[in-house]
Amino acid sequence: VASRDAHRPNLLVVLTDDQGPWAMGHRNRDLVTPAIGELVAGGTELDRFFCASPVCSPARASLLTGRMPSAHGVHDWIRGEAYGVRDEDSYLACLTTTPEVLATAGYECGHSGKWHLGTSRHPAPGFTSWYAHRTGDGRYVGAPVWRDGRAEDEPRYLTEAITDEAVAFLEANGANDRPFYLQVNYTAPHSPWVDQHPARYTEVYDGATFDSCPREEPHPWFSWEPGPVSDAMTDPVPSLLGYFASLTAVDAGVRRLLDLLDATGARESTCVVYTSDNGFSCGHHGIWGKGNGTWPLNMWENSVRVPFVVSFPGRIAAGRVDSGLTSACDLHPTLLDLAGVAVPEDPLAAGRSVLPRLLGEETGGDEAVVVFDEYGGTRMARTAQWKYVVRRDGPEELYDLVNDPDERENRSGEQGSAIRRDELAGVLHDWFARHNAAERDAFARPVSGRGQVSPLWRGRSDAETYASAAGERHAAAPAVSRRRPP
């Protein structure tokens, strides 16, 4: 398949949707994902890798551009046609993305699965192969997709359909000596979870009680709203079954892709990346959800930290764990560096290539490194030990992650922590001042976690740009079951 040159490698990026850092087979005794486990064993894991925003669309935009949301302008999940938006815009217009740069450098670029960055009716710039979900979530059978510009309901189980189309791309490029870039964007393990997945995946978990996931009292910030997350909080086992089964289905897809690369002799010249757009909590911290699973929006570790594994036989060490802090904004320059392609000049770029770390030429243990996150009016700065969160309108937070890894004790109001808090507040302020485009910034705008309906570059009013302001996001909490089946 395509390039056999390890110095101009093929690039395969597998991106899941809402996969918490705890939801990896080598960290979770309940999860069955042997193929992904082989990637971990055969590659290098960056185990403190952080999304740029703990929600789908802005996180994905940062992966593709190397910019933070305040510089690319995507600040909430994009509502799209599923929520009444017709004639969707392109949210990345005028921005340079990874596939665009690679295509210019001679790569064949393919996309299979979730896009969620505005219109997906036709291929985004840089792509020649395109199979795209029409929205950002929804059912796994009969899923809305675009096929050759026509809206269709996919008759196949969606996770397998995404794999099928990725396999078709690899097979179609088998006689092509150009290197490829293929992003396989699964919607799993995103909701809905119950009665969505074939028995061949759910039966793996027959009798499972999923004790690896906590049953905590609901957090006071948890958003009790009708739907999958509130159902999961009241009775978690059926939803946990779907969440875990969906990842086992992803694992089956990863197995098919790796087997095809092996069969065609391209595995040694293909760098495989496995990661997720943002994290997720399945009962952790007393919520089901990610950054918008609470009001105020949260920056807890399970929301902002995601799995990240790179496997490239012969170039990147097997079985190694790098615990340096790494940002999702680093993926864009790292992939270009791997391809031997110059990273375009961008004064607002927030990422840097971590290829030297992946090759073992540098370590990631610099205690001075800080990673940043943002979601509308909520921003985070995190060092190896401390996490500081500031909100335009809401509580300030400071956590000592060494002594309080579960983020239970907010020390922002302690006199003894004032120096640390003020130091991180200054670092955060100065950093965002350098990585910010005023016309794309939303710190002072009403981002509520209910979605974005228009790109900021259109210059429309807040009411025309964002779904309804947060308002009262807490309904009455129903009774919560802590039961586990016998």
Task: Describe every region a protein language model picked out.
Residues 33-34, 63, 114, 123, ...:
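Polar, surface-exposed loop/tail segments
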Residues 404:
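Intrinsically disordered, low-complexity polar regions and short flexible loop motifs
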Residues 13-16, 20-110, 129, 135-136, ...:
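Active-site segment of extracytoplasmic enzymes that catalyze sulfate/phosphate-ester chemistry
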Residues 125-126, 167, 384:
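Short, structured coil segments at secondary-structure junctions
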Residues 3-9, 16-31, 54, 134-161, ...:
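Active-site-proximal cap/lid insertion segments
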Residues 312, 381-384, 391, 401:
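Active-site beta-strand termini and strand-to-loop segments that position acidic
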Residues 25-32, 44-67, 75, 111-122, ...:
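Short, solvent-exposed turn/loop segments enriched in Gly/Ser/Thr/Pro and often Arg
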Residues 12, 16, 36-41, 64, ...:
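Non-transmembrane alpha-helical segments in soluble domains
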